[in-house]
Each structure stands twice: as C-alpha cells, then as structure tokens.
Curated annotation (Swiss-Prot):
Chain's role: Glycosyltransferase involved in the maintenance of the outermost surface of the fungal cell wall. Likely functions in the synthesis of a currently unknown, potentially minor but widespread, extracellular or outer cell wall polysaccharide which plays a key role in facilitating many interactions between plants and fungi by enabling hyphal growth on solid matrices.
Chain segments annotated as coiled-coil in the UniProt record: none
GO cellular-component term (any): extracellular region
Pfam families: Glyco_tranf_2_3 (PF13641)
Enzyme's top EC category: transferase
Domain of life according to the entry: Eukaryota
Predominant subcellular localization, coarse grouping: membrane
Organism of this sequence: Gibberella zeae (strain ATCC MYA-4620 / CBS 123657 / FGSC 9075 / NRRL 31084 / PH-1) (Wheat head blight fungus)
Cell location: Cell membrane; Secreted, Cell wall
Membrane topology: Multi-pass membrane protein
Entry-linked InterPro entries: Glycosyltrans_GT2/GT47 (IPR052427), Nucleotide-diphossugar_trans (IPR029044)
Family of the protein in this entry: Belongs to the GT2 glycosyltransferase family.
Name the UniProt record assigns to this protein: Type 2 glycosyltransferase
Length: 526
C-alpha cells in the first residue's frame, strides 16, 4: 500500500472523516478507564451535588416567627375536611385535636348516603360551629369545591380526616401570611408510630415514617433556596381564601385535564401548581409546634400508597415542566432538584453504576489507591447518603437504626414501583382503603368534546375563518384593525357563548347554524 493510500484509509470520499474524528471520541475511548472516570464524576455530581446543597439548606432553615401583633388569628380560619370514612366515630380524636386550635368554623364534606351519620358525630362535638355538607359521589375535588364557596374567613385550611394537630399549630401556620405575597403555608409532618405488633408491622410503619421524614427534609431545603416545592401536602395546608374561592380556581380545580381525560385525583398537586402559575409564594413551617401527625398503612397496602403517590408525581411534574413551564422561571433550583429528579432518580440503576464506574475508572491507579477510592465511595453511599435525611427519626428513636437495612432495600425496590407507576399513569385507584374507590371511575373521566362548530378543521389554520362580503384576502390594515378589537370567547363552565371570528380566506359557508353580519364582515356561531 502506497503512502497516499495509507493516509486515506477510513476517510469518506467527501472528506468528512477529518472533522468527525476531531469532534467524536475514538471507538476505544468508550471502553477506556477515562470514559468510566468521566461517567463516575458525572453521575456523582448529578446524584450528590443537590444532596450536599440540601443538607446545608435544611440545617440552616428557619421558620417564620410568630409576630407580636399578628394580622390573622384562629378566628380568621375555616377548616375544610372532605371525608368518606366508613366509621366516623374513629375520626373523633382527629377532629377534637383540630377543634382544640379554635378555628372560626369546621366544615365537613361527605357523600349523600353518609351525611346523617357524619351529622351525628358533628352534633356530638363540643364546638359552636361545625357544618356538614355533602356531594353526590365520593371525590375529594368535588367535595372541596362544595365547601370553598361557603367559607367566610380570610384563611382556609384544608386537611385530611386522619391528621392530629398540636394545640400550638394555629399561630405558627398563620405567621407566614404576614407577607402579602404568601399564598399557601404547609407544615412538617410525622407518622404515628406503632410500638406494638409484629416486626413486619413495625417495619412497614417505619418505612412510612421514613418517607415522611425525607419529604420534610426535601421541602424545607428547597423552600430555603428558592421557595419552591413539587407539592404542598394535602394532609394540612393553609391558603388565602381569596385564592381558593375564586371562580377561575374552582373551575380549573374541577376541570383539570390529563391528556384527554378530566383528572379528579392529585388535588394537592393542582393547588401547588396554581399558586406557582399565579405568582403566589409558599412556605413551610418546620417547627415542633407546627408538626402534624398522620397515619399510613402498616402492611403491604403501603405499596399501593407509594404507587399512587408516584403516579401523581409523574403526572404533576410532567405538567409543571412541559405543559405549564412556570417553574423554569420562578423555581429553577426546585425544578432541577425535585421535578427533574423524578425522571432520573432510580437508585437500583444509578448506585451499582456508580460503584462499577468508580472501580473501572480507576483501573490505571495502583491497587491500594483503587481500593481506597472504591470503599470510600461505598461508605459515603451507604453510611451518609442513605442516612442523612433520616437523622430526625434516629434522634427521636435511636433503636430505629435496626430498620436502616430495610430502608436501603426498599429504596431500591421503590425504583421499580416508580416504573410501574409510569406505565400505569391512567390508574387513579387508592387500593389501600376499602372506602377509597367507591367512585374511582370519576377520577379520570373522558373530557367532554366541544361542539362541531367550535372544532378546528384539518389544515394549517387555527380557526375557521369566514367572510361573507369580501371574496379576496383581507388587507393588512383590516387585519391590524381586527387584532385591536375585542374577541368574544368560549367559557367551558357555561353553555354556548358566541365566538366572533374573522378570516382572510375566500370562503363562504352554507350552514343554517351560522348567521352572517353583513355590516361588520363577521360571522357568529350560535
């Protein structure tokens, strides 16, 4: 082979091999220790940089202090609790803890068939103002919407029927509202611990407690950085009544769409996104005096709860990042650390890949340093990253350390739960409670189709455009004039509203449902 032929080996006839060879790594690079080292560093930064930042942010988090002269007191608060419980007497301890905080009113909302039983419980409570409402079906969004228009106080607290409040909660949860830009306030939470029962019951109970503890860690950290969170918990949250009682909110709350369906699940996610899209700030009061207690399943039913939460996260985070996109400008760190992490945090894939890339990436090192690097990563992964978010649990109950291996194993299994939730996004059932799925088909109902006269025809145009008098294209001046005029619109919360449309197209319809206004060159859809 001549020297010129040897130089041309591997080159394309068009001479593109040169630029490609400069811009792309060689084939051997993908199997080299350098590639694995780069991969390790990239994965490590993505997985642990936000954790280290969150550690500092969480440890330095400060709740809003109680003002000496508060703008709002407990008498400015109405508590709304939707419930479909089968044994209302079991709600008494929770309701009494809430009434001990002395709100102005407590509104309970259930279904038609359960109203009498709930009314008996309400009448037995020693409190001057407890109101019971009902809806035709069991659906949290519809039940909440039944109560919100009847709220007469400036602050509304929405709560679940199984939470227990400390008597000190009210002044702490109201303190952030001294800032007029704050629209919603959440609390820290803990799970009611089971100290009796079998070891498996205690283990499931601890997994639920660990889930809530991690959530406390994350939302306090992100709020301290940019005031963001992926979801304000529906277990207990305080909001300005002007937000929740507005027509736009109520309509959107009852008519949220997920793909081609009306979504009546994920209510707390909707409220959170609504606050963000309307430039309201949120806050979390991370104080013992503002810590509510809740209950989770202490058996395999906990897996149903995890899958339901995971579906909500997939749906809501996709809506936040892709459909609405307000978070990109308002909560950039939260977008990266919480929303984007939903799509990338699969520990059962990332952790083994981190250890493997650490080992293969240090292949050129001497064996002693190579082992030191590997075991340093191993200890950091399992002794720090798997523990730091749970320190609150271990401080309160040091014996919980025995459940740490259970937490690690479940963390890997939870990645599979997330993938299962991803491929079953259209499921909205609770699965974990017998009374939770009475009207499950209403949680994801087909969205109503618009009238045929309102549909956009095939083609590049976005509206049907008619012009009865002018047979040619409108002039530019006419188009500008039209753009400056008012439009009538269609409101899905009402019946048919005339839609005023114009067109530069030379089309004259023949339709008995269309009335042409000859004087204004417009057409009205009736």
């Amino acid at each position: 082979m001549s020297e010129s032929e040897h130089q041309n080996v591997g080159r394309s006839p068009l001479g593109f091999a040169g630029p490609l060879s400069l811009s792309m790594p060689s084939f051997d690079f993908w199997y080299s220790s350098t590639f694995w080292l780069y991969l390790f560093l990239g994965l490590w930064f993505h997985r642990y940089f936000r954790l280290l930042v969150h550690c500092v942010s969480h440890w330095t988090y400060k709740s809003k202090p109680i003002p000496s002269k508060p703008t709002f007191t407990s008498k400015d608060v109405t508590v709304v609790i939707p419930t479909i419980h089968n044994a209302f007497e079991e709600l008494r301890p929770s309701l009494e803890s809430i009434l001990a905080c002395e709100p102005a009113e407590l509104i309970l909302v259930t279904t038609h068939d359960k109203r009498k039983e709930l009314q008996k419980l309400a009448d037995s409570l020693v409190f001057p103002k407890v109101r019971v409402l009902d809806t035709p079906i069991a659906n949290k969004r519809l039940q909440v919407c039944e109560a919100l228009p009847k709220v007469e106080t400036p602050i509304t607290i929405m709560a679940d029927d199984d939470v227990t409040w400390p008597s000190t909660l009210m002044p702490w949860i109201l303190a952030p509202f001294e800032d007029p830009e704050i629209g919603g306030v959440g609390t820290c939470q803990r799970v009611r611990r089971e100290h009796d029962g079998s070891w498996s019951t205690k283990a499931w109970n601890w997994l639920g407690a660990a889930y809530i503890e991690r959530r406390n860690f994350e939302i306090s950290a992100t709020h301290n950085i940019d005031g963001g969170t992926s979801c304000m918990s529906g277990r207990t949250g305080a909001y300005r009544s002007e937000i929740l009682s507005s027509h736009d909110f109520l309509h959107g709350f009852k008519n949220e769409k997920w793909r081609k369906w009306i979504l009546n699940a994920d209510d707390d996610n909707f409220v959170t996104r609504w606050l963000v899209s309307h430039q309201w700030k949120t806050w979390i009061q991370y104080e013992k005096e503002c810590e509510i207690e809740t209950t989770l399943e202490n058996s395999t039913k906990f897996l149903y709860q995890c899958s339901r939460w995971a579906r909500s996260n997939w749906r809501s985070n996709w809506t936040s990042m892709v459909t609405e996109r307000y978070i990109w400008k308002q909560q950039l760190w939260c977008t990266y650390a919480l929303h984007f992490a939903t799509f990338t945090s699969l520990a059962f894939l990332i952790d083994p890949l981190l250890l493997a890339s650490c080992w293969w990436g240090t292949a050129d090192w001497d064996m002693q340093n190579r082992r030191y690097a590997f075991w340093s990563q191993f200890v950091f992964m399992f002794a720090f990253t798997k523990v730091v978010k749970l320190m609150g649990l271990f401080i309160r109950n040091p014996t919980d350390v025995m459940f740490l291996p259970v937490s690690v194993v479940f963390g890997y299994f939870h990645g599979l739960v997330k993938l299962y939730a991803l491929i079953t996004l259209n499921m909205t059932s609770w699965g974990s409670r017998a009374d939770g799925d009475a009207n499950d088909e209403q949680r994801l109902a087909p969205a109503p189709q618009p009238s045929i006269v309102l549909k956009t025809p095939p083609g590049k145009g976005s509206l049907i455009r008619y012009n009865a008098r002018q047979k040619g294209r409108q002039t530019q001046a006419q188009q500008v004039s039209w753009e400056k005029s008012d439009y009538a619109s269609y409101d899905s919360s009402t019946s048919y509203v005339p839609i005023r449309v114009h067109t530069p197209m030379a089309t004259t319809p023949i339709d008995t449902k269309l009335y042409t206004n000859e004087s204004s060159n417009t057409c009205w859809a009736i």
